[in-house]
Amino acid sequence: MTTIRKNHPLFKAANSALIDLPAPASLSSLWNFGSLLGLCLISQIATGLFLAMHYAPETSSAFASVAHICRDVNYGWLIRNMHANGASFFFVCIYIHIGRGLYYGSYLYKETWNIGVVLLLLVMMTAFVGYVLPWGQMSFWGATVITNLLSAVPYIGESLVQWLWGGFAVDNATLTRFFAFHFLLPFVILALTLIHLIFLHETGSNNPLGLPSNSDKIPFHPYYTIKDIFGFLVLLFALISLALFAPNLLGDPDNFTPANSMVTPAHIKPEWYFLFAYAILRSIPNKLGGVIALLCSILVLLVVPILHTSKHRSLTFRPITQFLFWLLIADVLVLTWIGGMPVEAPYIITGQIASALYFSLFLILMPMASWLENKMLTW
């Protein structure tokens, strides 16, 4: 059996990635979230495939087809609830995964980190086009508002928006192409995930101390396979509990009303996991400026490895930067809250301060804290 595992062309690749992989002995549960993201992706593809079998990507029947799935298809309600809430769990895992990377200096594996940022952008795009598919009020108006942001692009903006819409407004052509994108992109994400792993296995995993762990490695199986399976069980238990007991907790009530281009909802807002970026977008009182800020809120992650000046990799031994990291987490939570609030005082100024702090932490305060900590090492 060992010979097949180590010599077979297919099995040996899986063996070197999942069984005989040398892993640091001190990985905490924060290192579980990569495998949990893999589980979320597989779960979303599986449930999405079954939903696609019954969904009708056509404006006159999309909303009714989702109702049909929930009422008439065997366990359709469960599949739909698992898929909708699975997206929320996906983003919980992805944000914790990124937070762990920032805290422990995993971004110094630059190729792995950069592919991770591309994956984040693709997952966000997939979730956005997926939110449009039920064709409720918030689906329609969310699509209208966000796609309209492209009109801020100088010179070609208007043409770009009409090209994306397939007409002069969000309509049937838009829904059809968004369904095509939503079906295709998870498989692109799957392929990029494999590349993400290939680059990770070139260097090996980082560890909580941020120190080289070549002298202290253990085989991935059984130690971390058991740990990952435990993580899977916890995640699935939480997801199934949410899907069964409070399936609409994270959704928007407006989306239970079929899309109507003649009636605008009082407050147009995206799903909770985009609210921090939406708050940053709204904090700039200029359309193009807001779009640039929105993009930079994600792309700022690409400059984190460049701005790393500390002699330590991890924040484990860096109390000042540790404080700034938790300030960043609090700031993102404040932005998430502001994104769900109406555009009025005091939310406007609070959002602007939180947005300024968000970029300051990444671009100014954390690099300065690293420089100060380096100085303190020589005192």
Swiss-Prot record:
Primary location group: mitochondrion
Keywords from the named record: Electron transport, Heme, Iron, Membrane, Metal-binding, Mitochondrion, Mitochondrion inner membrane, Respiratory chain, Transmembrane, Transmembrane helix, Transport, Ubiquinone
Free-text cofactor note: Binds 2 heme b groups non-covalently.
Residue sites binding heme b b566 per the record: H97, H196
GO BP annotations, alphabetical order: mitochondrial electron transport, ubiquinol to cytochrome c
Assembly description: The cytochrome bc1 complex contains 3 respiratory subunits (MT-CYB, CYC1 and UQCRFS1), 2 core proteins (UQCRC1 and UQCRC2) and probably 6 low-molecular weight proteins.
The name this protein goes by in its record: Cytochrome b
Swiss-Prot/TrEMBL cofactor(s): heme b
Signal peptide: none
Keyword Mitochondrion tagged: yes
Family of this protein: Belongs to the cytochrome b family.
Note: Heme 1 (or BL or b562) is low-potential and absorbs at about 562 nm, and heme 2 (or BH or b566) is high-potential and absorbs at about 566 nm.
Keyword Transmembrane in annotation: yes
InterPro entries associated with the record: Cyt_b/b6_C, Cyt_b/b6_C_sf, Cyt_b/b6_N, Cytb/b6-like_sf, Cytochrome_b, Cytochrome_b_C_euk/bac, Cytochrome_b_N_euk/bac, Di-haem_cyt_TM
